[in-house]
């Protein structure tokens, strides 16, 4: 996959759009099929650059993921508001995976209170999201609780191939495999 948290920048710390677009398209032209971004990446500009890179038939070649900035959500309606804003920035009618970003105990409580399941059902029914998911940044016990809270299609964990003990990556990966996620 191609993560879009960090792109080359210009001296004034803006994304070097032409270089970022060249990199994304080069990756796709050479077999990369997964593009990952999120609302806060590059101060909200990453999604805009990706939208430009995925023009001219490139969108149809990839699985596109972006993330709901859970820490900014205050109401149930905010979830759809952020999704619509992100779809506009990405210049696409849908994302393949829309994931709750950086879930932890506090954020999971908030999402449950605001009925994230209804949001996902609505977004999927409207054709804006294909699959729900979450990214996770907390301990293994809560990880199990989040997994049990819904019928998830997708999960991103922090994983370092050189240190499988970091963030309980080995245990989390084994659990995800056992659940076919």
What are the roles of these predicted feature ranges?
Residues 1, 33-34, 61-67, 94-99, ...:
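Structural preference for beta-strand elements that scaffold enzyme active sites
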Residues 5-18, 67-77, 108-109:
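Active-site mouth loops of central-metabolism enzymes
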Residues 103-181:
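Beta/alpha (TIM)-barrel catalytic core signal, keyed to glycine-rich beta->alpha loops juxtaposed to Asp/Glu
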Residues 29, 51-61, 84-93, 124, ...:
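Acidic (Asp/Glu)-rich catalytic clusters
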Residues 1-62, 93, 119:
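N-terminal binding-site loop/beta-alpha segment at the start of enzyme catalytic domains
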Residues 41, 57-77, 101-102:
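Structural motif corresponding to the early beta-alpha repeats
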Residues 13-27, 74-91, 137-147:
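Short, acidic/polar
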């Amino acid at each position: 996959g191609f993560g879009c948290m960090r792109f080359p920048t210009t001296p004034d710390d803006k994304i070097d759009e032409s270089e970022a677009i060249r990199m994304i398209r080069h990756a796709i032209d050479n077999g990369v099929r997964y593009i990952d971004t999120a609302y806060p990446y590059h101060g909200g500009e990453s999604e805009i650059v990706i939208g430009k890179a995925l023009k001219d038939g490139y969108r149809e070649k990839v699985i596109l993921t972006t993330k709901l900035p859970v820490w900014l959500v205050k109401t149930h309606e905010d979830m759809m508001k952020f999704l619509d804003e992100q779809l506009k920035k990405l210049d696409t009618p849908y994302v393949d995976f829309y994931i709750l970003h950086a879930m932890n105990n506090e954020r999971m409580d908030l999402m449950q209170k605001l009925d994230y399941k209804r949001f996902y059902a609505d977004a999927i029914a409207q054709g804006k999201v294909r699959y729900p998911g979450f990214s996770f940044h907390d301990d293994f016990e809560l990880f199990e609780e989040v997994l049990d809270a819904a019928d998830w299609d997708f999960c991103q964990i922090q994983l370092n191939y050189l240190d499988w003990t970091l963030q309980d990556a080995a245990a989390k990966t084994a659990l995800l495999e056992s659940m076919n996620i």
